């Protein structure tokens, strides 16, 4: 067994602090990775603070982080896809049952027995899995992704969650040239949603509660920006959207956006506020509108998304921070003060 430097939280009220965690020796199908960057997803914060206690209670200590990129340092004897030195990524999943219909279809993200990168039972070491706020990780090669060589590694890290979570529903619901697409919430997920919708050829409208993000939204690829607190500006778009991606992390009025859908339009929730959202039947029935959800993506589609990013030169706009600033970053995340994803430089763990 190896040990790895990491940052963990001991309780839902504790800050993240330096610790040491065990990592297994690589088995025959395993890849050992030196983690170089890890994005900070709002899901990390929800989990550290046990905000999803009803659905997935947090086991402490927790080491979050599921937007991992790094270099392969060692591979097991049966590994065929990777060799030491390769640039790789690990997202939200590190295992699944591999036999259920969803796994067979490459939709491991919907496997009933999936192992999340952190806070899932660890089949190898007991306890729970530990995520990417650490300097190394060992993962079965099936759950390791290849990062295109032209992509900046810090900017590529958020693709592993924010990227696939926004790419997958857009592909599923047919976002293409000529479609009018809304993105609600210009945070980590939202800014990736804007980049993908634009790259897929759609007409893109950002809805934000932060007027100061207008210029950035346009720079990121939006054709139009609506400050969602402006009722008149909202009304101008009533009944016009083919697809809306809702990436808001907190309680909000989802009906205000459902009302903007055209006949048969679709609003997909990817944001995961802890409390249920109230949905007006009238918003849905007046226009045969659809409300759906989506959770990250399967392994084949995650690789497809990374390759798409390689071809289109798409990365996340990141603010790189040392791990010692992680608690401050969480407070800024709560104030929607991030442009547009924090990426932890794990070299900073060396001084711990
Ligand atoms: P984030 O970077 O914090 O962005 C969230 C954005 O939501 C903020 O920047 C803000 O955008 C908007 N917002 C925040 N509070 C709001 C409020 N009270 N009312 C209206 N808008 C508000 O978070 P993220 O990492 O992108 O994650 C977003 C959500 O998706 C989280 O709940 C996360 O857990 C979830 N998630 C889901 C999946 C999945 O697979 N489904 C994967 C990853 C994350 P503006 O300033 O533009 O208004
Ligand atoms: Zn995430």
Task: Label each PLM-derived region with a short phrase.
Residues 24-38, 52-104, 109, 148-151:
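Glycine-rich beta-strand-centered segment in the early N-terminal region that forms part
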Residues 162, 185-189, 272:
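Glycine-rich Rossmann-fold phosphate-binding loop(s) that bind the pyrophosphate
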Residues 177-186, 196-256:
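Adenosine-nucleotide cofactor-binding segment
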Residues 261-262:
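Helix-to-beta-strand junctions that scaffold the AdoMet/dcAdoMet cofactor pocket
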């Amino acid at each position: 067994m190896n040990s790895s430097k990491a940052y963990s939280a001991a309780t839902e009220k504790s800050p993240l602090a330096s610790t040491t965690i065990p990592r297994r020796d690589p088995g025959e199908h395993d890849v050992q990775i030196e983690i170089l960057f890890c994005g900070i997803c709002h899901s990390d914060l929800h989990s550290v603070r046990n905000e999803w206690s009803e659905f997935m209670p947090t086991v402490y200590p927790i080491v979050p982080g599921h937007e991992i990129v790094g270099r392969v340092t060692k591979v097991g004897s049966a590994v065929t896809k990777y060799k030491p030195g390769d640039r790789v990524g690990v997202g939200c999943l590190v295992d699944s049952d591999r036999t259920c219909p969803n796994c067979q279809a490459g939709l491991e993200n919907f496997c009933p027995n999936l192992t999340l990168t952190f806070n899932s039972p660890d089949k190898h070491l007991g306890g729970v899995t530990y995520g990417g706020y650490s300097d190394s990780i060992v993962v079965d090669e099936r759950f390791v992704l290849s990062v295109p060589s032209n992509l900046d590694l810090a900017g590529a890290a958020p693709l592993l969650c924010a990227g696939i979570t926004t790419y997958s529903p857009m592909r599923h619901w047919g976002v293409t040239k000529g479609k009018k697409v809304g993105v609600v919430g210009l945070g980590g997920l939202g800014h990736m949603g804007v980049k993908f919708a634009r790259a897929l050829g759609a007409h893109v409208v950002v809805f934000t509660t932060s007027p100061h993000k207008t210029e950035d939204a346009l720079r990121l690829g939006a054709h139009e920006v609506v400050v969602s607190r402006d009722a008149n500006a909202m009304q101008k778009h009533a009944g016009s959207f083919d697809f809306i991606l809702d990436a808001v992390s907190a309680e909000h009025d989802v009906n205000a956006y459902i009302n903007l859908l055209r006949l048969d339009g679709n609003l997909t929730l990817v944001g995961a506020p802890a409390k249920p959202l109230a949905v007006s039947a009238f918003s849905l029935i007046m226009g045969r509108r659809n409300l759906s959800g989506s959770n990250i993506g399967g392994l084949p589609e995650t690789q497809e998304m990374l390759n798409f990013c390689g071809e289109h030169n798409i990365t996340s706009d990141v603010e790189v921070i040392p791990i010692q600033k992680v608690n401050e970053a969480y407070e800024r995340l709560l104030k929607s003060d991030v442009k547009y994803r924090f990426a932890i430089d794990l070299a900073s763990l060396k001084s711990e």
